[in-house]
Amino acid sequence: MSSPFVPIITADIDWRDDLPYSLQFDDIYYSAEGGINQSLYVFVEGNNLINRWQQLPTNESNVFTIAETGFGTGMNFLLTWKLWEKFAPQNARLHYISCDKHPLKKNDLIKCLQKWPELSVQAEKLIAHYPVLTPGYHHLTFSNNQITLTLMLGDVLECYEQLLFCGDINLEHQLRESYVNAWYLDGFSPSKNQSMWSDNLFTVIAMLSKESTTVATYSASSIVKTALTNAGFVIEKRKGFGPKRHMICAHYEKAYSSSKKNRHTPWHINYPVTKDERTALIVGGGLAGCFIANSLAKRGWEVTILEEKEKVGCGGSANQQAVLFPKLSTYKSPFTQFMLYSFLYANDVYKELLKYYDLGELKGSLLLAHNEKEKANQQSLIHWLELYPELGQLVDEKQSSELSGISLPCGGLFIPSSGWINSPELCDILIDNKRISLITGNRVQSINYNQKNWVVNGIEASVLILANGQQVNYFHETNHLPVKAIRGQMTTIQSTQESTKLKIPLCAEGHVLPALNNSHKVGASYDIGTSEPELNALDDQLNLARLKRIAPDIMWSQNVLDHWAGIRAASPDYLPIVGPLPNALEFKEIYSELKSNSKRWIAEAAPCYPNLYVCAAFGSRGLTTIPLATEWLAGLINKEISILPRKLIQAISPARFLRKKIIQGP
């Protein structure tokens, strides 16, 4: 289902006596006497964080999670980040989750953060990575992945509710292996912003908490005390900051009850399974396998990749100039949301990598309005792009020719932050880690579980991840996954004096890349149902014909230097298949009653194979979607709070096809 895209309304700031004042909430962001000292006293000391951090285990898999209800100027985050690096164990990781319905525009944020030069190091990095302010979840990483920020833009209750598995407090705590360790309840005062202090929000906070979870807030309101108490927290008395008489500290004790109206059957998640060791086997050495290996290795896991070819990045990930661009839409659906979230995260990842490796270029790309349908689709974005020019700009024929460097027959949509990446080289970089072992020439035909670990070709690990593209449903356990093969052939042609002027990728019915090593990559065929990568001359001619339609005024070489074909794997809904793998027969039995009511509450998690996960079917957008999907999956395996909302976890879940079949019938 889709609905119109509703943009974020940014904060309306009025500067009074050089202090930021919210016109939406008729309240000040911070007082002249407050600022850093108030944040330190209320939130850091109120949650006893420094003492707790100093007692943490010293390993990469350990994550301390702080959640905040109002991001505001980001000061709390920056101060916490600075103190974490000073007092926490070197290898421990901080996950900071925050939310804002009306985030600050970047210029306002910069002005606010100039007030605290002692946080300038952290502030500079936050500003550099500050996201495009689109609704939903934004995941940012800092300090070599030691600090992560999940910034949720939207209504605080809706955003945090999406972090729940099911919304039933008893089952939620049975399923949950990851909890918030400390809460910063920071928002405009209860009298000015009641939604930030609602009973429903505190019920969600309780479901994301465990017995050691603490809460701190500057407020001493009886409304807040009552709401926290009703949610299962024990209130502790503490003097307020400065002249303020009181503030609230609390710790979570026990669950009481939750509304039956907001429960969701957790068909997408399994009951926790013990992992005796942090070891993982990954079948498949393409982009998906290499990204998930990298994400787990950064968390301290020992990873082994089994690849049937002679090196990584050979199959569908062998494109040396893979194009990165989003699928923009004025409508919000699981597909368009996942594509946008993924593009923004991937762009951040690749920008960081390009600082150290010559992997490609992110100088933009041009999606040509090559027919009336595409032109209409692009024109429908005009108001959306006025709000988010960082994502795309509509250009006419003259502008498109200037941007691309060559004469073009039409305008289009310029995506300024996109470009191309060398996928095989990226794979090599991702697995360059002492915790990652690669075994090549290793074809996997069966997988086995010995009641403790997974065993594949004589190699044993506690976790198994199937990232082998179109072959992912070759096993007995996975044969219910509806994966289709799509063959694509790229053609390499000699560059000419005229064609070398092309500066950015051009995409239309096909696509062409800027010259690299005196040649252009042109593509690509799209043969659904073809699972063999044999090369053929006809596809080269079709690619050249597409090229001529893209830029008919350019004298393109007809000299084919090389060609390459790969097999993409895709699902029926063109979203990837990522997450725990369900047992098909048991799933159908447990959830059979969904047939009569698809929204029926069933108090059972999905029956999944223990510690078996799928990470496949990324289609032709793997470069865009794989980084976020694998980072989420690594977090799930490592028992971390999700960086994706529940609705998107369900949208990419391997169980979605079984559920759909139950509801719709054979």
From Swiss-Prot:
Keywords: Cytoplasm, FAD, Flavoprotein, Methyltransferase, Multifunctional enzyme, Oxidoreductase, S-adenosyl-L-methionine, Transferase, tRNA processing. This is tRNA 5-methylaminomethyl-2-thiouridine biosynthesis bifunctional protein MnmC. It catalyses: 5-aminomethyl-2-thiouridine(34) in tRNA + S-adenosyl-L-methionine = 5-methylaminomethyl-2-thiouridine(34) in tRNA + S-adenosyl-L-homocysteine + H(+). Catalyzes the last two steps in the biosynthesis of 5-methylaminomethyl-2-thiouridine (mnm(5)s(2)U) at the wobble position (U34) in tRNA. Catalyzes the FAD-dependent demodification of cmnm(5)s(2)U34 to nm(5)s(2)U34, followed by the transfer of a methyl group from S-adenosyl-L-methionine to nm(5)s(2)U34, to form mnm(5)s(2)U34. The lineage of its organism: Bacteria, Pseudomonadati, Pseudomonadota, Gammaproteobacteria, Legionellales. Gene3D superfamilies: D-Amino Acid Oxidase, subunit A, domain 2 (3.30.9.10), FAD/NAD(P)-binding domain (3.50.50.60), Vaccinia Virus protein VP39 (3.40.50.150). GO terms for cellular component: cytoplasm. Its main location: cytoplasm. The gene is mnmC. Its cofactor is FAD. GO terms for molecular function: flavin adenine dinucleotide binding; oxidoreductase activity, acting on the CH-NH group of donors; tRNA (5-methylaminomethyl-2-thiouridylate)(34)-methyltransferase activity. GO terms for biological process: methylation; tRNA wobble base modification. PANTHER family: SARCOSINE DEHYDROGENASE-RELATED, TRNA 5-METHYLAMINOMETHYL-2-THIOURIDINE BIOSYNTHESIS BIFUNCTIONAL PROTEIN MNMC. Transmembrane segments: none annotated. It holds the Pfam family DAO. Residues 283-666 are annotated as: FAD-dependent cmnm(5)s(2)U34 oxidoreductase. Its EC number is 2.1.1.61, 1.5.-.-. It is found in: Cytoplasm. Residues 1-253 are annotated as: tRNA (mnm(5)s(2)U34)-methyltransferase. In the N-terminal section; belongs to the methyltransferase superfamily. tRNA (mnm(5)s(2)U34)-methyltransferase family. SUPFAM superfamilies: FAD-linked reductases, C-terminal domain, FAD/NAD(P)-binding domain. NCBIfam families: MnmC_Cterm, PRK01747.1-2, tRNA_MNMC2.
